[in-house]
Amino acid sequence: MGRMHAPGKGLSQSALPYRRSVPTWLKLTSDDVKEQIFKLAKKGLTPSQIGVILRDSHGVAQVRFVTGNKILRILKSKGLAPDLPEDLYHLIKKAVAVRKHLERNRKDKDAKFRLILIESRIHRLARYYKTKRVLAPNWKYXSSTASALVA
């Protein structure tokens, strides 16, 4: 799938393993992996950061193959899921950083244009999450309160 506001085609992607079974050399059980997920979530890590740590440090290629559920679903079952979806959170964080840059560099027209693109992606993603009932129907992105959301 191509990029929304860039000319790139976005062809690079990670390859999923062909077999969906748990590798024989993996000694962690489903409960061990879940405990590790809860421990990392309590430290304040996002689901993708948890997945990277489990992959690199514990040898769990896909949490879904071991536990039967994705990381976010496991976190939701315990009530540890983040209140904002991760992709929306990172877009808001990027918009706050660009806005902070614009306060120091008022004449940066390109940054002003990129901020408009970032905020349009935020609005589009928020509209999607409202239809999927992940966000409250009255949730609204306001640039004045955005820095409080990501702090």
Curated annotation (Swiss-Prot):
Classification via Pfam families: Ribosomal_S13_N (PF08069), Ribosomal_S15 (PF00312)
Keyword Cytoplasm appears in the UniProt entry: yes
Subcellular location: Cytoplasm
Entry GO MF terms: small ribosomal subunit rRNA binding; structural constituent of ribosome
PROSITE patterns linked to this entry: RIBOSOMAL_S15 (PS00362)
InterPro entries for this protein: Ribosomal_uS15, Ribosomal_uS15_arc_euk, Ribosomal_uS15_N, uS15_NS1_RNA-bd_sf
Record-linked Gene3D superfamilies: 4.10.860.130, S15/NS1, RNA-binding (1.10.287.10)
Entry keyword set: Cytoplasm, Ribonucleoprotein, Ribosomal protein
Example GO biological process: translation
Residue ranges that the Swiss-Prot or TrEMBL entry lists as coiled coil: none
Domain of life, source organism: Eukaryota
GO-annotated cellular components: cytosolic small ribosomal subunit; nucleolus
Subunit and interaction comment: Component of the small ribosomal subunit.
The family this protein is said to belong to: Belongs to the universal ribosomal protein uS15 family.
Function: Component of the small ribosomal subunit. The ribosome is a large ribonucleoprotein complex responsible for the synthesis of proteins in the cell.
Name of this chain's protein: Small ribosomal subunit protein uS15
Organism for this UniProt entry: Gillichthys mirabilis
